[in-house]
């Protein structure tokens, strides 16, 4: 990292201002050559984290009046000397300033290169770096809060505890291998089992929250299914707050999947409205119904809509039988019933009680609060939704931790079965390697390139 990089940190296009970020060993020299401050004495003080107004020049020609932020190494975002040039928001002006900096020795930054330098300079670990991308992409308060907790290092702290435990376990084993004649604790297999069990407990605790974390980060794939004309499209429109799907009394109106995103109780749902389930001779409708069944196979949540006062159809019973734990049954059109039937007593009409059943009416706005409560219950797995407990949410990190758990479990089995300690150490070392991959302490350059390529150019 002996070169200096520059990139536009704001979105391409016209606006009130553009921000150019410059970082590297030549950053100060480039700015000194191109920037004429309005207050030279204050500029010469070289105070850190300060803003300075002045002219940015290309030789004798003034390009713009700019505001420059100075952040000196090692206290900057990248750990290098960083200057942020705030210019007027025309893209032409920003490009002129960028070209001048490149002419003075900088080069255009690659995608994510500023954050990659921050990682390589020890300003943040890989989990914190990936959380920055998640924060930028966040679509709900919950996903933003999750990313912020990871950026603050709260998740990294828990992983560091796990890593320390596994490192101590490995040292414990290696002491037993190196000094087999000593009557020390390292020869005690029960003590070793306890150490491995502690590591497994810490790792599994992290994994337990990963489903919640992943849903908060990516959303929950939710499929709306049911017979024709039970209110599937009406529910989609109600959740969206707009007429997204066509609603008619004609069966088979929805023939293809309609996909939309909606936030309920701070949780992002990736909604799929499907074709009504029935026997049909229409080729196009039959294809839509086949897609409905395939969508259910991938769904994390199935909203099965049935019509109040009607017996369950074969397709509905099949869904309840096959996808019991994933189903919430919405007994829709409660507004069409009279008397006691409009209350909880309606549940008595359905002897099959797989899944969760909610009396519902899109027309009268009945059942939406209970639906939101049930969705939260499933996502947070009964825990308080406002918890600040850091959660795993990144599939790369989750996969690495799953491999670490597998390696620790293999090590535990090896000890229990009386295998030599050098054999046990192979599994424990593998677990340590996987945990180090999570934080970036031990990671291949190709993986780093892949991770940081997902960032925008100016980040």
From Swiss-Prot:
Binding site for GTP: 229-234, 248-254, 273-276
Molecular function terms, GO-annotated: GTP binding; GTPase activity; metal ion binding
Any one GO cellular component localisation term in the record: cytosol
Record note on cofactor: Binds 1 potassium ion per subunit.
EC number(s) from the headed UniProt entry: 3.6.-.-
Residues bound to (6S)-5-formyl-5,6,7,8-tetrahydrofolate: 21, 84, 123, 459
Keywords, sorted A to Z: Cytoplasm, GTP-binding, Hydrolase, Magnesium, Metal-binding, Nucleotide-binding, Potassium, tRNA processing
N-terminal signal peptide: none
Matches recorded under InterPro entries: G_TrmE, GTP-bd, GTP-bd_TrmE_N, GTPase_MnmE, MnmE_dom2, MnmE_helical, P-loop_NTPase, Small_GTP-bd
Pfam family, one: MnmE_helical
Domain (TrmE-type G): residue spans on this chain: 219-380
The keyword NADP is annotated on this UniProt entry: no
Localization annotation: Cytoplasm
BP GO terms, sorted: tRNA methylation; tRNA wobble uridine modification
Essential cofactor(s): K(+)
Protein purpose: Exhibits a very high intrinsic GTPase hydrolysis rate. Involved in the addition of a carboxymethylaminomethyl (cmnm) group at the wobble position (U34) of certain tRNAs, forming tRNA-cmnm(5)s(2)U34.
Similarity-based family: Belongs to the TRAFAC class TrmE-Era-EngA-EngB-Septin-like GTPase superfamily. TrmE GTPase family.
Binding partners and assembly: Homodimer. Heterotetramer of two MnmE and two MnmG subunits.
Identification of the protein by name: tRNA modification GTPase MnmE
């Amino acid at each position: 990292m002996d070169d200096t990089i520059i990139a536009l940190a704001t979105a391409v296009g016209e606006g009130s201002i553009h921000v150019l970020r410059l970082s590297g060993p030549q950053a100060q020299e480039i700015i000194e050559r191109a920037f004429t401050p309005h207050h030279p004495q204050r500029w010469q003080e070289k105070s850190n984290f300060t803003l300075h107004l002045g002219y940015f020049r290309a030789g004798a020609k003034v390009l713009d009046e700019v505001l420059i932020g100075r952040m000196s190494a090692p206290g900057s975002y990248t750990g290098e000397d960083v200057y942020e040039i705030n210019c007027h928001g025309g893209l032409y002006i920003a490009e002129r300033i960028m070209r001048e900096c490149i002419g003075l020795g900088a080069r255009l930054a690659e995608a994510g290169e500023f954050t990659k330098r921050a990682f390589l300079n020890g300003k943040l670990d890989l989990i914190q770096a990936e959380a920055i991308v998640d924060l930028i992409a966040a679509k709900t308060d919950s996903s933003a809060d999750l990313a912020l907790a990871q950026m603050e290092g709260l998740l990294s702290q828990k992983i560091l505890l796990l890593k320390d435990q596994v490192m101590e376990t490995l040292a414990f084993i290696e002491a037993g291998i190196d000094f087999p004649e000593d009557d020390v604790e390292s020869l005690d297999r029960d003590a070793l089992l306890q150490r491995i069990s502690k590591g497994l407990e810490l790792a599994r605790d992290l994994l337990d929250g990963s489903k919640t974390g992943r849903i908060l980060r990516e959303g929950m794939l939710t499929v709306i299914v049911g017979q024709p004309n039970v209110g599937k499209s009406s529910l989609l429109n109600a959740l969206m707050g707009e007429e997204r799907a066509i609603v008619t009394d004609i069966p088979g109106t929805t023939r293809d999947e309609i996909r939309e995103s909606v936030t309920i109780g701070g949780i992002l749902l990736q909604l799929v409205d499907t074709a009504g389930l029935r026997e049909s001779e229409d080729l196009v409708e039959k294809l839509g119904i086949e897609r409905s069944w395939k969508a259910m196979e991938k769904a994390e949540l199935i909203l099965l809509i049935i019509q109040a006062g009607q017996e369950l159809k074969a397709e509905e019973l099949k869904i309840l039988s096959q996808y019991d734990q994933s189903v919430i049954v919405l007994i829709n059109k409660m507004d069409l019933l009279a008397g006691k039937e409009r209350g909880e007593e309606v549940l008595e009409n359905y002897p099959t009680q797989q899944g969760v059943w909610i009396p519902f009416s899109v027309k009268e706005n009945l059942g939406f609060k209970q639906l939101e409560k049930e969705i939260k219950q499933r996502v947070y797995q009964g825990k308080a939704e406002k918890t600040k407990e850091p959660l795993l949410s990144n599939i790369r990190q989750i996969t690495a931790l799953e491999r670490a758990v597998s390696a620790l479990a293999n090590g535990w089995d090896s000890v229990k079965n009386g295998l030599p300690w050098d054999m046990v150490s192979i599994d424990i070392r593998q677990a340590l390697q996987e945990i180090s991959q999570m934080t970036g302490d031990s990671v291949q350059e190709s993986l780093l390139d892949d991770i940081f390529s997902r960032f925008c150019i100016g980040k």
